[in-house]
Structures are given as structure tokens and as C-alpha cells.
Design a protein with these regions (language model features):
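Catalytic cores of nucleic-acid ligases and guanylyltransferases
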Residues: 1-379
Length: 379
């Protein structure tokens, strides 16, 4: 029987010894990106939840939540602890996702989820009440003294369905062996803020830290104004481009960044954009952000300290807002692109003033409950 210690918990105790057969450090199984859903026999499909990946360790009254990167989540989501005790077996390890349903019934609210990672306990408690989270289970890793990683997914899915007593805010994700149902989910549930669809082979074991599953994500393109950039963390070249879209009032809204460039392209971008930095501050659409950065005053700005890494430099270099880039993105939420945005090409044939929100094709809202209710559909 493996014994281990949980890192930090809601009470900041470091001596919580677990008798589960699995303990931290533990890295979850991952998914590799595909442009098409795999078809044929032997596959199971699930909605791809857009939240925080979370491994739940329950040992009697002890419940600990661990992130994909093995960081403790427990103190940030105290409202989940009692529901998890009520819904999960006494001793188990469950893989799933923490999400926050929008209270107005428009799907998931990822921005509200981001706000939950905060160092002040008073704010943690307040947000737990104002924007309560849910947990969606989609795999089981251990039950009692048994590690079930080597068992095929079809068997693990059956164990999960029998083990979890779904009661809000704890759920079991819908699943189907029908590719037609999965294709329907892919299109229909985008409006709920879901990323796409995940496919798992019914005979696959659970392989920690390996890309065994298949994920198919939504992708669209947009023309955006490039209004600044950040230097790469190694100090060599451009690490990311700051993107903007004009709203109906004529304001240029910061909608995200394009990044993940090759080393050669980072250097090329720095050389190409350097002339655009000249006289860029005066009249810049984000001049107030530039001035805030120069004064180093605290506040929520593009140059603020990262919530995830206090040592991360988010300072940026303004350029004249004259360049247009075509980018690919997955989702738009709260007026901003979600997750990574990919640079495709420069568009010298486009005018910055034409880079508006109304060019975007946005999915109609779908309620969180409609997604959960899909479990009753074809299997």
C-alpha cells in the first residue's frame, strides 16, 4: 500500500498521511490534438470540459484536490469538499474537471474560475459563495486498495458510474460510443463554453503523463490589430503578440495574445516590429496601460503580476496600432480569446479599423444542465 503526503490543503497542513494506493506526485493522462474525430468500433466519446483538470483524493473524511501540475487546489474550492464526501466512495482517486456554471444559464464561466485562484482566504470564502464551482468526474484511478489504471477504459467507466453518486455540484460526464452523437455534441455544446470532444479507446489503460486520448477542438480565424508585444522569457526575440479588436464604441479591446513561435520567427518578429515602436505611445489606443506600466502602480492590467507565477514578467512593448494579423482561436468568452491563439499570417490588405468583434462567428449559448443531461442520449 503506497503512502504519501498531500502538499498544502485548506488548513495548510503538511502532515496529512494517506493510505490510498495512489498518492502525489501523480500526473494525469493527457490528450493529443486531432483535426477529426476517430470513427469506428472501440471508441468512447465525451464533451471536452473547459475548466481546471483536477485529481480528487478521498481517504475517509480527508479530501484533497490536485491540479494537473500537481499543485494543491483544495484551499481554493472549499465548497466542493462536503459534496465530494457525499458523492464519492470513502477511499478513491477520481480524475475530472472543476468548472463554474454561469448563473444565468449560458454555460461555463472560465473568467470566474480564474478569479478563484487567489491568495487571500477571505476572498476565497467569498467567491466560494458567489461563484460556486462544480466537479465533473470522467475517470477512476483507484477504489479502496485497488489501483485500476491497467484496466481498460470500458471497465473503468463502468466502475465510475457505479462509484459516484451524482448530486449537484458533483457530476459524471456524459459519454457515448456513437460517433454521430459525438459530432452532434461537438457542434451543439460549443455555446456552453466547451472546448470540443475527447475520444478514448475502450480497451486503453490509464497512462499517466502520456497523450493517449484524442481531442478535437473548435477552431476559427479572426483578423486582429497587433498593438504590442512581449519579449520572450529567454530575452531573445518576441514571445507573444498583443491582439486587439474594436468594439462598437471605437475602443480597441485587448482580446488575448498569439504565442508559441519558433526561435527563428521570434527573432524575425523583433526585427520586423522594431520600427513600429517609434513614436508608438502618443495616441496609442492603450496609452493608459502604457502609462500604468511606466508608473508601476498596482492594478489589473496587461502588465500585472501573473496569478499563476508571481515571477513572470508581463511587461510589454507598445507598437503603432497599424498592423493586422490573421490568427486562429478556439473560443471567445467575456470578449476575450480563450486558451492559446495561433498566428497564421500578416494581412497587409486589411485595415485595422475593420478588425471588429462583429467579424466573429460566436456559438449560441447552451446551458450547463443541457450538457450534463446529454448522458441520457444515445450511447
Amino acid at each position: 500500500m503506497r503512502r504519501g503526503k498531500f502538499p498544502g490543503s485548506l488548513t495548510d497542513r503538511q502532515d496529512v498521511v494517506v493510505t490510498l494506493p495512489l498518492a502525489l506526485p501523480f500526473k494525469p493522462m493527457l490528450a493529443k490534438l486531432s483535426r477529426e474525430l476517430p470513427a469506428g468500433d472501440g471508441w468512447s466519446y465525451e464533451p471536452k470540459w473547459d475548466g481546471f483538470r483536477c485529481i480528487v483524493f478521498r481517504d475517509g473524511d480527508g479530501v484533497e484536490l490536485a491540479s494537473r501540475k500537481e499543485r494543491p487546489f483544495t484551499r481554493y474550492f472549499p465548497e466542493l469538499l462536503d459534496p465530494l464526501r457525499a458523492s464519492l466512495p470513502d477511499r478513491c482517486v477520481i480524475d475530472g474537471e472543476i468548472v463554474i456554471p454561469d448563473r444565468e444559464g449560458r454555460g461555463l464561466d472560465f473568467d470566474a474560475l480564474l478569479q478563484r485562484i487567489h491568495p487571500a482566504e477571505s476572498r476565497v470564502r467569498r467567491l466560494a459563495s458567489e461563484t460556486p464551482a462544480s466537479f465533473v468526474a470522467f475517470d477512476v484511478l483507484a477504489l479502496g486498495d485497488d489501483v485500476v489504471l491497467e484496466r481498460p477504459f470500458a471497465e473503468r467507466r463502468s466502475l465510475l458510474a457505479d462509484a459516484v453518486r451524482p448530486t449537484p455540484p458533483v457530476y459524471v460526464t456524459p459519454a457515448s460510443t456513437s460517433a454521430a452523437v459525438a459530432a452532434d455534441w461537438f457542434g451543439r455544446f460549443e455555446g456552453a463554453g466547451l472546448d470540443g470532444v475527447v475520444a478514448k479507446r475502450l480497451d486503453d489503460p490509464y497512462v499517466p503523463d502520456k497523450r493517449v486520448m484524442i481531442k478535437v477542438k473548435h477552431e476559427r480565424t479572426a483578423d486582429c490589430v497587433v498593438a504590442g508585444y512581449r519579449i520572450h522569457k529567454d530575452g531573445q526575440g518576441v514571445g507573444s503578440l498583443l491582439l486587439g479588436l474594436y468594439d462598437d464604441s471605437g475602443g480597441l479591446q485587448h482580446v488575448g495574445v498569439a504565442a508559441a513561435f519558433t526561435r527563428a520567427f521570434r527573432t524575425e518578429l523583433l526585427t520586423e516590429l522594431e520600427p513600429s515602436t517609434h513614436d508608438a505611445v502618443e495616441g496609442h489606443p492603450w496609452q493608459d496601460w502604457v502609462e500604468w506600466q511606466a508608473s508601476n502602480e498596482p492594478g489589473r492590467r496587461p502588465g500585472n503580476v501573473s496569478r499563476w507565477n508571481a515571477g513572470k514578467d508581463l511587461s510589454w512593448v507598445p507598437i503603432r496600432a497599424e498592423r493586422v494579423a490573421e490568427v486562429s482561436f478556439g473560443q471567445l468568452e467575456g470578449g476575450r480569446f480563450r486558451h492559446g491563439v495561433s498566428f497564421r499570417r500578416w494581412r497587409p490588405d486589411r485595415e485595422p479599423a475593420d478588425c471588429r468583434y462583429d467579424q466573429l462567428d460566436v456559438a449560441d449559448p447552451v446551458a450547463f444542465g443541457d450538457v450534463i443531461g446529454a448522458a441520457a442520449e444515445g450511447g
